[in-house]
């Protein structure tokens, strides 16, 4: 029998650089309350959000993703031609084909790099990180560009006062490459498909049947999500730490999906994180950007000096599906 030839494998992978872009319009809680029946104080108390970013009409998922990716590429010192693959995590690309990754690859001049989108909802970036890690370690790629990007303001239901204030627009990107030492820990991922209706986006036929709708809208059962996050997500975060062979005290930074500050606090307490661990609260002036929240938070924490190159960080995303994915990484 003729054997199948395989490519040389790499030992490990790591994050090389990051970049981010945010919607240019700042929407404060006060302004939000002119659109919905609520108060700025109630929104902040329930979520930790004081303002969020909405993109303008000219700011698209393609343009924001390209901006974040270009920054990451410049910081990496690599040439565009060296990128072997681009993975874009998003639920906001309204054209099923071609992929958003293909559009961004064209803008960046990535040539014949493999390009595809991934729908992992709010866990999309962590899913994509796991794929990039596997691609590199199996020899399928040397450098992978991973992007999380969303324009959720288009899909926000302003008639739903329980969710309208949550969502935001932006993009985060990272370049992942081969490494001689472990830079990305084993992923802990999975789903609870019996909870499909807990968070969902309307299908296009339903949305298009309503003359008042331009895009499908988000529907979420907030209490059910909170209950799930308190139990299952907290458990999976602990598993990701254990899979990396470390303890909570070894962490420098905890960067969960920026869904709600109360969820972040509950998971942090469950993990028994010591005071030495910096916990990300990027949601305060960013809002919830689904697949973009983790990479945006990583980049902003690095740029603001809240985290540093070489730090050990636990990242975890969770959202519609219900899906989750998390791993320990070393920051670039």
UniProtKB/Swiss-Prot annotation:
Q: Report the principal subcellular site.
A: cytoplasm
The reactions it catalyses are:
butanoyl-CoA + malonyl-[ACP] + H(+) = 3-oxohexanoyl-[ACP] + CO2 + CoA; 2-methylpropanoyl-CoA + malonyl-[ACP] + H(+) = 4-methyl-3-oxopentanoyl-[ACP] + CO2 + CoA; hexanoyl-CoA + malonyl-[ACP] + H(+) = 3-oxooctanoyl-[ACP] + CO2 + CoA; octanoyl-CoA + malonyl-[ACP] + H(+) = 3-oxodecanoyl-[ACP] + CO2 + CoA
Pfam families tied to this protein: ACP_syn_III, ACP_syn_III_C
Could you tell me one molecular function GO term of this UniProt entry?
beta-ketoacyl-acyl-carrier-protein synthase III activity
Region ACP-binding: which residues?
Answer: 258-262
Which NCBIfam families does the record associate with it? Answer: fabH, PRK09352.1
Q: What is this protein called?
A: Beta-ketoacyl-[acyl-carrier-protein] synthase III
